[in-house]
Amino acid sequence: LGYDVKAAEVSLTFKRVFRAFQEKCFDPVLERYTDGAGTKHAGLHANMFPLAFGLVPDQWVGKVAEYVAGRGMACSVYGAQLLIDGLYRAGRSRDALSLLTSRSDRSWGHMVFDIGTTMALEAWDTRYKPNQDWNHAWGAAPANLIPRWLVGVWPTSPGAETLQIAPQPADLSFFKANVPTIRGAVDVHFRQTGTTANLSVTLPGNTSATVVLPRPPENT
């Protein structure tokens, strides 16, 4: 954008904050982030947020992701967005898919099949929030998690002129997706049987894409 001086200032500030965050909040003995300076308690939220936003150094991603995955859906439907973002970012697609398809009382499956809603709720269940509404956008995280992470469609330049297609299907045997972009829809079809997988991508005529073939989940 031409703001070179401002970009340098922001970059320097980020490096300082990042370093301070690691020094104050990461416990190398626990191998995870604590809830704050001076405490040994390390909750799910203290770890899923840095995992989702790319604030975990590479050498600790595996341990932090393992801890986050082990906690399950121990957060609100609002927090579920960042929890699953973090798992997919860390390559733990099997854990992410398990949460997306769960039928526990903290799941979208519970909303649909047990409660009977046809819209995303404000909370997992009325027992957790008696005054919740039955039409709440913050409860609809799968609407963006599935196309971005499971199907793997990401714009890589302004206006979706270029894309990256990097599916993370985990154990799904197949999926068919039609992902809208400002330049037209992207069709992604995937099927796997045993050790054989087939991936088909159809792009709008005014775009190009880099295709990244699915790799085995980290938690295999």
Language-model segments: residues:
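Catalytic cores of carbohydrate-active enzymes
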Residues: L1-N131
